[in-house]
Amino acid sequence: MAEQVVEILVSGGKATAGPPLGPAIGPLGVNIMQVVQKINNMTKDYEGMSVPVKVIVDTDKRTFEVEVGIPPASALIKKEIGIEKGSQEPKHQVAGNITMEQIVKIAKMKQDAMLAYNLKNASKEVVGTCVSVGISVEGMTPSEAQKAIDAGQFDSYFN
């Protein structure tokens, strides 16, 4: 069985037969429109976000499987607080504020893909991502929020 794996980032629910998908899948001998349709059905819940997708093609049988990953934490943060873009100057300009409840929700979604061994540390990773997006956490800078997590201020969210 000759298996080819194509990994791409697509906009949730809006994959097309054009680049980057079409040129990567076309030569493998499967119906591109079927692949696009399956990807769009599987990613429609992530509309407006970049979603990692893995297309596994069996070139002998001309069949395919689609595996959808979880969008990057930055995309989940922006969707959760309802903004399209983060701050242009993340350390100087705040693009929005996120609650610890929302942080924990994102951490639970991403936990399997993270190196953190518990929800508290996974949440700290998500808070760390807030630095690069320019988002405050409960009105604090992300570094202040991480110190507050370490101090136990938000422990009620992790039980």
Swiss-Prot record:
One of its GO terms (biological process) is translation. Keywords: Ribonucleoprotein, Ribosomal protein, RNA-binding, rRNA-binding. The keyword Cell wall biogenesis/degradation does not apply. InterPro entries: Ribosomal_uL11, Ribosomal_uL11_C, Ribosomal_uL11_C_sf, Ribosomal_uL11_CS, Ribosomal_uL11_N, Ribosomal_uL11_N_sf. GO terms for cellular component: large ribosomal subunit. GO terms for molecular function: large ribosomal subunit rRNA binding; structural constituent of ribosome. SMART domains: RL11. Belongs to the universal ribosomal protein uL11 family. HAMAP family: Ribosomal_uL11. Part of the ribosomal stalk of the 50S ribosomal subunit. Interacts with L10 and the large rRNA to form the base of the stalk. L10 forms an elongated spine to which L12 dimers bind in a sequential fashion forming a multimeric L10(L12)X complex. NCBIfam families: PRK01143.1. Forms part of the ribosomal stalk which helps the ribosome interact with GTP-bound translation factors. This is Large ribosomal subunit protein uL11. The gene is rpl11.
